[in-house]
Amino acid sequence: MDEFKPEDELKPDPSDRRTGRSRQSSERSERTERGEPQINFDDIELDDTDDRRPTRAQKERNEEPEIEEEIDESEDETVDEERVERRPRKRKKAASKPASRQYMMMGVGILVLLLLIIGIGSALKAPSTTSSDQTASGEKSIDLAGNATDQANGVQPAPGTTSAENTQQDVSLPPISSTPTQGQTPAATDGQQRVEVQGDLNNALTQPQNQQQLNNVAVNSTLPTEPATVAPVRNGNASRDTAKTQTAERPATTRPARQQAVIEPKKPQATVKTEPKPVAQTPKRTEPAAPVASTKAPAATSTPAPKETATTAPVQTASPAQTTATPAAGGKTAGNVGSLKSAPSSHYTLQLSSSSNYDNLNGWAKKENLKNYVVYETTRNGQPWYVLVSGVYASKEEAKKAVSTLPADVQAKNPWAKPLRQVQADLK
């Protein structure tokens, strides 16, 4: 423990210092204790010329008037600018400058495009006139009545020199009358016959009356309706083969001119549906006999007369004897008509063919060696019509099966099963 010294009483304790005292006051007190001279700043007079250290308050006070001065100056400047803007400004005239190179190139390009458009338009219009001149100059007169050799060589007749054959004939139509009149009948040419058919042209040939007119035309014609065949009476099939070879060796004779039937439609009339009927044929082992009507109702077309295949051999053949038809009260009939009348009406029969010519139909049945056939007469549009039927069958299926037993030529005509009630109604 330190000893107490008398000097210690004179020394102040630093712990006894007041908290508010500054370091200068402490230093001053120490200096006074030591006896050092002190300067009293209050007694010193400072000149205004000396720079004083400004305080913060003084700085703020000095800055405020400076800011006010700057604001006043800026306001004055804005007012001056507004005054200057309000004054009308004089427009300065643009100095005339030479055209730039770019503008010159654009103008040249536009001129070139215009020239191209004009040139293309003139080129398109020019060929039309030149082509018309070429076509006019390239036209050649063709003389149809001239010689073929001259036309082949390119020789053209001199203009202005025309013969009587080349002169053009004026065609004048007759004047039209105000009142309806009958049309002029065209001039009939040689080898043709005019036939007037009633009804529409599409269904005119299906009418029995029109078929009869066509049959009459075919009968009156001088042309054969079937190819000529040669069949001697003796030697059977061997002589038939020899006749074919002879006809092949001999040249064909000239044929007479055909007769054409001109069909003109008239006013339509009520048509009656006809049943399909096979075409009648003439016997093969005969000379060319009378022409046969070859019309077929379901086809509604008239078959043209076929050409002669060869000349007939000069051999006389016996024509088949015509069978006498058993006359009945209704008209011409052949066969057992009573069996058809007495059979039940629910049964069926086979219709083989029909025609307006009784003799041809009966002769064809004889030629095909048909058995139990019946030819009976009926009327159709007021005209006689003959139907060829064969057999009596209990059902339609049985009648269809019986078709296979018929000759091949008969089967080719497509026979069909017909109810007996229709046959019995026709016989009454």
UniProtKB/Swiss-Prot annotation:
One of its GO terms (cellular component) is cell septum. The chain crosses the membrane at residues 104-124. Residues 236-248 have a biased composition (Polar residues). Keywords: Cell cycle, Cell division, Cell inner membrane, Cell membrane, Coiled coil, Membrane, Transmembrane, Transmembrane helix. It comes from the Bacteria. Residues 65-82 have a biased composition (Acidic residues). Residues 342-419 form the SPOR domain. Residues 288-335 have a biased composition (Low complexity). Residues 86-95 have a biased composition (Basic residues). Residues 55-87 form a coiled coil. Gene3D superfamilies: Sporulation related repeat. Its main location: membrane. It holds the Pfam family SPOR. The keyword Transmembrane applies. GO terms for biological process: cytokinetic process. It is a single-pass membrane protein. Residues 1-99, 149-191, 225-344 are annotated as: Disordered. Residues 7-36, 50-64 have a biased composition (Basic and acidic residues). It is found in: Cell inner membrane. Belongs to the DamX family. The SPOR domain binds septal peptidoglycans and is required to target DamX to the septal ring. Non-essential cell division protein. This is Cell division protein DamX.
